[in-house]
From Swiss-Prot:
UniProt name for this protein: Growth hormone-inducible transmembrane protein
Post-translational modification: Undergoes AFG3L2-mediated proteolytic degradation, upon hyperpolarization of mitochondria.
PANTHER family referenced in this protein's UniProt entry, alphabetically: BAX INHIBITOR-RELATED (PTHR23291), GROWTH HORMONE-INDUCIBLE TRANSMEMBRANE PROTEIN (PTHR23291:SF112)
Topological domain spans for side Mitochondrial intermembrane: 105-126, 182-191, 236-245, 294-346
Family, as annotated: Belongs to the BI1 family.
TM regions (residue ranges): 84-104, 127-147, 161-181, 192-212, 215-235, 246-266, 273-293
Organism name: Mus musculus
Molecular function GO terms recorded: calcium:proton antiporter activity
Chain segment of the transit peptide: 1-45
GO cellular component, one term: mitochondrion
Mitochondrial matrix topological segments: 46-83, 148-160, 213-214, 267-272
Domain of life: Eukaryota
């Protein structure tokens, strides 16, 4: 969620990709090309003039200028590569849905195991997804309330370090509070902390309301389709098929997080800034889709192995939070992708 927050603050107000893209090289691009041409030096040898061409590698300063100079043609290509990457991930997900959903796999999935589940396992999974639906509803209400409060909306839209720091503190504090309260021993405070956490997340999502209701409604439908399809894949796949992806997903999360941080300090119209933006946006969409597969099977596994009368009880709110954060990350990226896509068509 931290990466999603950073990307949203950096990219939405600035509207990185303008509706029209230049097709001719700008003066800055021409100057860069001129500086990097062959260096021609005359020399005299035995009364005969010859031209000697020497190769000159780019200096560190020139590499920095090339990475930071504006080039809308390159930015457009980088954006297209990111969208093709997402399209490839969608094709793989659709293939997995057909493969596992049609029962082509020889291994037993969670949906087959559900027939022999005890009733308490079914109740645990049902309550987990009910809390997920409640969190999404509370987040939407909170975002709407913040959007209709000018003072709060202005604070969330500034993008200053004070806003970012306060947002981080609120998210981390609310998350720690929810996890620290016992679901069995203190149900009242637990539910209050859960609602507080959903409200904080709604404030984080509130800046997206500037994109308009129709676009956000489309993003919500697309997100519902993505989450529903991936949840079906996780249910139909072998019960531990995606639980071995923890280490690669951690590496990918670090890459997306670093790209999100880097995009804050680089001009969005530069090649380097656009590259980091694409990694954080499009790579993040694929990454959190894979996280959703992992977390869904993790929730099912926890519901199965947690003993009914053990010392450690099953907590549906804590179990739901990972899927909720994945869903929120996917929604924010889908909404931003739709916004940049509609900008280009104008």
């Amino acid at each position: 969620m931290l990466a999603a927050r950073l990307v949203c603050l950096r990219t939405l107000p600035s509207r990185v990709f303008q509706p029209t893209f230049i097709t001719k090289a700008s003066p800055l691009v021409k100057n860069s090309i001129t500086k990097n041409q062959w260096l021609v030096t005359p020399s005299r040898e035995y009364a005969t003039k010859t031209r000697i061409r020497t190769h000159r590698g780019k200096t560190g300063q020139e590499l920095k200028e090339a990475a930071l100079e504006p080039s809308m043609e390159k930015i457009f290509k980088i954006d297209q590569m990111g969208r093709w990457f997402v399209a490839g991930g969608a094709a793989v997900g659709l293939g997995a849905l057909c493969y596992y959903g049609l029962g082509m796999s020889n291994e037993i999935g969670a949906i087959e195991k559900a027939v022999i589940w005890p009733q308490y396992v079914k109740d645990r999974i049902h309550s987990t997804y009910m809390y997920l639906a409640g969190s999404i509803g509370l987040t939407a209400l909170s975002a709407l309330a913040v959007a209709r409060t000018p003072a709060l909306m202005n604070f969330m839209m500034t993008g200053s370090w004070v806003t970012i720091g306060a947002t981080f503190a609120a998210m981390i504090g609310a998350g720690m509070l929810v996890h620290s309260i016992s679901y069995e021993q203190s149900p009242g405070p637990k539910h209050l902390a859960w609602m507080l956490h959903s409200g904080v997340m709604g404030a984080v999502v509130a800046p997206l309301t500037i994109l308009g209701g129709p676009l956000l409604l489309r993003a919500a439908w697309y997100t519902a389709g993505i989450v529903g399809g991936l949840s079906t894949v996780a249910m139909c796949a072998p019960s531990e098929k995606f639980l071995n992806m923890g280490a690669p997903l951690g590496v990918g999360l670090g890459l997306v997080f670093a790209s999100s941080l880097g995009s804050m300090f680089l001009p969005p119209t530069s090649v380097a800034g656009a590259t980091l933006y694409s990694v954080a946006m499009y790579g993040g969409l694929v990454l959190f889709s894979m996280f959703l597969l992992y977390d869904t099977q993790k929730v099912i596994k926890r519901a199965e192995i947690t003993p009914m009368y053990g010392a450690q009880k099953y907590d549906p709110i804590n179990s739901m939070l990972t899927i909720y954060m994945d869903t929120l990350n996917i929604f924010m990226r889908v909404a931003t992708m739709l916004a940049t896509g509609s900008n280009r068509k104008k």
